[in-house]
Amino acid sequence: MSRQDVQRLLEEYQVINELLATLQAQHTTVSELLEELTTALDGVRLLKTEGGERLVHIGAGLFVLGTFNAREVLTPLGAGYHAFLDLENAERILKERIDEYSKVKTSLEENIEKLIERAAQIRQVLERLGIK
């Protein structure tokens, strides 16, 4: 293996590690968003059940106790626009978003796995050549 080949492998290894860091950060963001969407979906489903008091998280670890008769929720539509939607449509939109982001998460996981495998291959070659 020529010096240039070794240099290319080292450069590829560095690029792969940078890509891995970026994809892992994106994976974390998507995972957090999925958790938030799932929490929102649970909230909409709770609103669909009748009666009873509920604790509602209002931020910074604070909760308020309340009784809700809401049949609509203010839902983000994108581009800064919001609309009041009935609970059924809000639930449908949340499910669609969860499906979309689940696919993105799966794709990220597949790409991360491929990059990890390639990095391991390069590392093995470099170690055989005595380069760490």
UniProtKB/Swiss-Prot annotation:
The keyword Chaperone applies. It is found in: Cytoplasm. InterPro entries: PFD_alpha_archaea, Prefoldin, Prefoldin_subunit_alpha. It holds the Pfam family Prefoldin. Keywords: Chaperone, Cytoplasm. One of its GO terms (cellular component) is prefoldin complex. GO terms for biological process: protein folding. Gene3D superfamilies: 1.10.287.370. Its main location: cytoplasm. Belongs to the prefoldin subunit alpha family. Molecular chaperone capable of stabilizing a range of proteins. Seems to fulfill an ATP-independent, HSP70-like function in archaeal de novo protein folding. NCBIfam families: prefoldin subunit alpha. HAMAP family: PfdA. Heterohexamer of two alpha and four beta subunits. This is Prefoldin subunit alpha. The gene is pfdA.
